[in-house]
């Protein structure tokens, strides 16, 4: 198993698919990385040489924010919005949808399990 950006990526999958196991790398970035390094898309991880794995590792470290750094950056962005007291920050603070979705019905994922209200029977 190759270890890239602190993640064990599966050895029997294609490189483009295996790179997507890293938080912050999706299909487009995975293809971009393999093109930069010069690895064919159909090559499997267990067929990579140590030099190629090192090239992939260096390309990711140099050009992308992934894993813990990305999670930390997103958390800091949300905290900044909350500290500013802007509308988006208030919505985050109250655990409500941030991007304009309706909340009268729906929004159960963000709000949590429905709380029963006593005396609401007909």
Curated annotation (Swiss-Prot):
Protein name, entry field: Small ribosomal subunit protein uS13
Gene Ontology cellular-component annotations: cytosol; small ribosomal subunit
Family, per entry: Belongs to the universal ribosomal protein uS13 family.
Gene3D superfamilies xrefs: 1.10.8.50, 30s ribosomal protein s13, domain 2 (4.10.910.10)
PANTHER family: 30S RIBOSOMAL PROTEIN S13/40S RIBOSOMAL PROTEIN S18, SMALL RIBOSOMAL SUBUNIT PROTEIN US13M
UniProt KW keywords: Ribonucleoprotein, Ribosomal protein, RNA-binding, rRNA-binding, tRNA-binding
GO BP term, example: translation
Known role: Located at the top of the head of the 30S subunit, it contacts several helices of the 16S rRNA. In the 70S ribosome it contacts the 23S rRNA (bridge B1a) and protein L5 of the 50S subunit (bridge B1b), connecting the 2 subunits; these bridges are implicated in subunit movement. Contacts the tRNAs in the A and P-sites.
One MF annotation (Gene Ontology) recorded for this entry: tRNA binding
Alphabetized Pfam families for the sequence: Ribosomal_S13 (PF00416)
Organism of this sequence: Methylobacterium nodulans (strain LMG 21967 / CNCM I-2342 / ORS 2060)
SUPFAM superfamilies (UniProt xref): S13-like H2TH domain (SSF46946)
Cystine bridges: none
InterPro entries named among the record's database cross-references: Rbsml_uS13_C (IPR027437), Ribosomal_uS13 (IPR001892), Ribosomal_uS13-like_H2TH (IPR010979), Ribosomal_uS13_bac-type (IPR019980), Ribosomal_uS13_CS (IPR018269)
Subunit relationships: Part of the 30S ribosomal subunit. Forms a loose heterodimer with protein S19. Forms two bridges to the 50S subunit in the 70S ribosome.
Span list, region Disordered: 95-122
